[in-house]
Amino acid sequence: GSGQILLRTVFLSLDPYMRGRMSDAASYSAPVGIDQTIEGGPISRVVDSQHKGYQPGDWVLSGNGWQDYAVSDGSGLINLGAQAEHPSYSLGVLGMPGFTGYMGLLDIGAPKAGETLVVAAATGAVGSVVGQVAKLKGCRVVGIAGGAEKCRYAVQHYGFDVCLDHRAADLAQQLAA
């Protein structure tokens, strides 16, 4: 219809907060009902548009949830343009998880060069950003992850100084070192 945009979902994000939404346990937000669309910010492609600000082929970040197609009036959409090189980055390092890690560390943690920072969930969307930004700030970064493979990844790909496997039998000894 007039002023509307037809969107096709291409990328979905599984963000840490969603786990709480998929349980009826007490949480800061209500759980998703069986018959409801899971909330989330997918990256979609404009299929058809009757809206002057959007053209077919544009990539958009929306709040339309986990569904194949959605119709929008443009409210709340972020147009990434038709030539976005890596649109999925807007769901991770350039999106909510990356922003959370970056701002949380710098505004709340306020790390100083030479300090040691311990990062839980070191290979997760938020933890991986926290560790990398802390390294840029001159910190010694100790990650915690579940499994030797994740720990290797944190050190080799994200630049953590060391990573402790919380599943290892000798975790207390690792922490003491």
List the predicted regions and their residue ranges:
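Glycine-rich beta-strand-centered segment in the early N-terminal region that forms part
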Residues: 1-14, 22-66
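Short, glycine/acidic-enriched capping/hinge loops at junctions between secondary-structure elements
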Residues: 18-22, 125
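Short loop segments at secondary-structure junctions
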Residues: 47-52, 74-76, 83, 167
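A structural motif shared across PLP-dependent enzymes of the aminotransferase-like
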Residues: 63-76
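Glycine/charged-rich beta-loop-alpha catalytic/anionic-binding loops adjacent to active sites
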Residues: 75-90, 114-116
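Mid-domain Rossmann-like dinucleotide-binding core that forms the NAD(H)/NADP(H) cofactor-binding site
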Residues: 91-174
